[in-house]
Amino acid sequence: MLDPMGNPPAHTQDRTLSLHWLWAIAIAAIAFVIRLVPVLRGGGPFGIGNYDDGVYYAAGTAIAHGLLPYQDFLLLHPPGMPLLLTPFALAAQFTSDSSGFTAARVACMLLGAINAALIWKILKPIGATAALFGGLSYAVFYPAVYSDKSTLLECPATTALLITILLLQPLINSGSISRWKIFVAGALVGLTITIKIWGFVTLMIVLVWLLLIRRFSAALQVLIGSAALAAVICLPFFAVAPTAMWNQIVRDQLFRRGGGGRTFLDRLDAIAGLGIVGRSYPAAITVAAVVALLFCAALAWSYREARLPVLLMLGQGAFLLITPTWFPHFAGFTAAPVTLTVGAAIGRLIALVRARPAQIVVSLVLAGALLVYASGWSDITFGRRFPSRFQTFTATAPGCVTTDDATTLVATDTLSRNLSRGCRFIADLGGNSHDMAAAAGLEVSRNHNQQFQRFALDYLGSGSVSILIRYPGGRGFNAKTTAVLDQWPLLARSGSYQVRQPVGLGQPAIPGLPKPQRR
């Protein structure tokens, strides 16, 4: 029944609003659980992750101790992510490094859950079905989960992008929007640039979309907002070390090569979310998945609300195909545009089916397909457990602890202790090989980079204890370097993980440490 003004009763409106947010909360909860459980089953909250996540957290901790990236240590990305992690690193000074890192990881999982809810919100004007499928698709989409499970660059960059889309949405239907909202949207795009330089690709696509819908003044305001925020965050670091910052963020990234998935097919496979499949399959499956995504793009294009996501999916996807390096989390760059496009396409497909019974059948079939895809998470794990007994050796180390993976310093709660003791700090040991190769103008692998081999040995040997987990068996350290490391007393071993006591040839072992293991 309507009131005299033609509006539904207040209690009906309240119930609708409650149901409205219930869907968002449910989608976010599913997304959070999907991100948390594989980590708990795998390495656990204190485990070893992707290497990169430890690099960014270690960099944030160094900033909390007064060090500056580019000037005091190498960082191959803009400073946005370490700055975002600095509050967790500061809080860790009152607890422990591992606790701060765990809190940061959980925060990223929560951001992933928020991202899923934002996708639902963005697609809501298209229809409830599109919003539901879009949000749930992101919740279980392998590239999204992989990137949101820890402190990787793609997670906060996705959040910034989705809020940008939401803020600019009124422009689609010639609606009015305040200048400050447009400026904030631009600033958020600028934030993506300060997190990863790939944000420039996102900015260009957003500007092209605004020009296509003839929002010229909005495009200018977005450009100004993005430039302003990027300048505020990056210029202080650039002023201190301009050459080093340029070389590390731009030159080294353009010059570097490496990672798996070097073929177009491998990359398309990851972008389409087929990484969830734990067994081999014919290339025809990948081709079919890509064709399905292009079909979704064609369907979604009929909605003006979905055109920016479609452009982002195609533009960012094309960029991923040509970038010189590739790692699994790179597919997270397109995760949100892909699921937004899929959600809008499903909404359009169901709308094309006129008969209500047929719509129900199509919805059930698509829901079943999504459920089958999500079932792939039943046995997936992320990360590796770190041997707790290694802390016996690091806790009693009289000097510094060195490592080939900064995550081990976090796991043993020696990162902040090292920094307080004035130990030599290296957030990204492997990244130095890219910097050295680019500076020399040589395309040389890490194993054959003699300058890096000397650099790594010099650093690892500067500690009283060294934890080696990343480059065993010739994967990063060549035979000569490995032979030197093997001469150091072995304190503990767990699988390929080792704790060694660096000593020079002919020098005695450092007293006060637990007795080395017999080999």
Model region roles, listed by residue range:
Residues 106-126, 163, 295:
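Transmembrane-helix motifs of polytopic, lipid-linked glycan transferases
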Residues 277-310, 314-317:
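Hydrophobic, aromatic-rich transmembrane alpha-helices
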Residues 135, 162, 179-197, 202-209, ...:
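Membrane-interface alpha helices of multi-pass inner-membrane proteins
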Residues 124-129, 162-184, 294-305, 346:
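Membrane-interface transmembrane helices that cradle and orient dolichyl/undecaprenyl
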Residues 7, 171-174, 202-228:
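Perimembrane helix-loop-helix junctions
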Residues 116-140, 159, 305-311:
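Transmembrane-helix signature of polytopic, membrane-embedded enzymes
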Residues 76, 380-383, 391-449, 453-477, ...:
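Short periplasmic/luminal acceptor-recognition loop of GT-C membrane glycosyltransferases, typified by
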Residues 146-156:
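Short acidic/glycine- and proline-prone juxtamembrane loop motifs at membrane-interface regions
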